[in-house]
């Protein structure tokens, strides 16, 4: 599968909303399904740079939203059918300044698959804390250099 990453445009928003809602319900299974709403996407990504990953047919396979002033990865979601196909790594590699820019993110400890993915991508835990919906590292940071992506 060839993955193309590009900046999202207004026409992508409906598909991104659906992926965001579906992925959160699948990922955060301990939360009631009605805790998540389609409109959450608009609120949680406001002002962020959105990059979309598409497969060979132009179908959305995943997206990342970044708060650029702080190099903070706010959301990175990959469609379940595309897990372990390089979509997440492609989204990271396509981030501005990658791999030299040091990006940060937060991830719940209960989200073991995501933590494993970020560790495999050379992110390291730099703190821990609590969140409304569970215990989480307060921050995870990408190590420099990212030899894995050279």
Positions of the model-derived regions?
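Short hydrophobic/aromatic beta-strand or adjacent loop that forms the aromatic wall/cage
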Residues: 48, 134-141
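Active-site acidic-Proline motif in GNAT/NAT acetyltransferases
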Residues: 79-85, 109-110
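Conserved N-terminal entry element of GNAT/NAT acetyltransferase domains
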Residues: 1-11, 143-150
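Acetyl-CoA-dependent GNAT
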Residues: 7-81, 92-96
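Conserved acetyl-CoA-binding loop-helix of GNAT-fold acetyltransferases
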Residues: 84-97, 116-120
